[in-house]
Design a protein with these regions (language model features):
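Bacterial Sec-dependent N-terminal signal peptides
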Residues: 1-29
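Short acidic/polar alpha-helix capping motifs at helix-coil junctions
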Residues: 2-3, 42, 155-158
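Short linear S-[DN]-x-LW-Φ motif typified by the pepsin-like aspartic protease active-site region
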Residues: 26-84, 153, 165, 183-185, ...
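Short, surface-exposed interaction patches in beta-rich subdomains
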Residues: 28, 61-63, 71, 167, ...
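Right-handed parallel beta-helix
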Residues: 31-36, 79-171, 221-238, 242-248
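Residue-level detector of short, conserved catalytic/binding motifs and their immediate flanks
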Residues: 39, 172, 193
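Solvent-exposed coil/turn segments that connect beta secondary-structure elements
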Residues: 46, 55-58, 65-67, 84-86, ...
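Internal hydrophobic scaffold segments of catalytic domains
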Residues: 67-104, 182-198
Length: 248
């Protein structure tokens, strides 16, 4: 597979924060973490989708919602905060994940149906027929909205969820392994910008010229590097997902 650098008008909102189907039970998250002068922030998440931005307060705000098996196992989701030297480390875990019951999820068009066991699913098939889109596993819908102080060096690692950046003032490094990165940037306030993927694409409508001097495109690897204005450094990487660079 060969990845492509694509310059396009990005007018379609991504579906990472829009979910079709009936409402599910969920638990709200609300946590704050103080940040001292000179500290940096490191975050590591597995399943959550993350929306991150900056604000003027000297603290980190972590909000969002958790739904695990329609609210039945929300208490398994934990946010962990540790400090090491000048670094604040934030991560999540799903406690006793191997013990959480799996569900059968069936998709019919835009409708999502969840069955607790095979007997329920087979009964549904008797009257509705078989579906080609069936998944078995824990039903998880976890979305985090995080605000960090402006101009604080921040690093995020996400495994399965997308990382969305509607606005960010300060040095930022994002690695979203499978979910991809969607960043909105004000070009004049961006210093060095680096975007990288292995099996996805890089899409942008920023005023940046793509040439052999600032881009490398090979089988299974695409890298773009540019200096757009004056400001902090941004690095966005998604080995298996897409990177979207939007003009703000």
């Amino acid at each position: 597979m060969k990845t492509l650098i694509t310059t396009a008008t990005l007018g379609v909102a991504l579906a990472g924060w829009l979910f079709a189907g009936s409402a599910t039970a969920q638990t709200r998250i609300n946590k704050t973490v103080p940040v001292a002068k000179g500290q940096t922030i490191r975050m590591k998440f597995d399943y959550p989708g993350v929306k991150i931005s900056t604000w003027d307060k000297d603290e980190i705000s972590i909000g969002g919602t958790v739904s695990i098996n329609n609210g039945e196992h929300d208490d398994a989701f934990k946010i962990n905060v540790k400090s090491s030297g000048n670094t604040i480390m934030i991560s999540n875990e799903i406690e006793n994940m191997s013990r959480i019951p799996q569900r059968i999820t069936v998709y019919e068009g835009d409708q999502k149906m969840i069955f607790k066991d095979r007997a329920e699913w087979e009964k549904y098939q008797e009257t509705h027929g078989r579906s080609n889109r069936v998944n078995m596993g824990i039903d998880m819908d976890i979305k985090l909205e995080i605000k960090v102080p402006r101009n604080v060096d921040t690093d995020i690692e996400a495994v399965y969820g997308m990382v969305e950046i509607p606005e960010f003032t300060g040095p930022l490094t994002v690695q979203a392994t499978y979910g991809g990165v969607d960043a909105s940037l004000t070009e004049k306030n961006v210093g060095e910008l680096i975007a990288e993927t292995n099996y996805g694409n890089i899409y942008t409508n920023l005023e940046m010229k793509i040439s052999q001097d600032n881009a490398r495109e090979e089988d299974f690897h695409t890298l773009v590097r540019a200096n757009l204005g004056t400001g902090p450094r941004y690095r966005f990487e998604s080995p298996y997902g897409n990177v979207y660079l939007r003009k703000k």
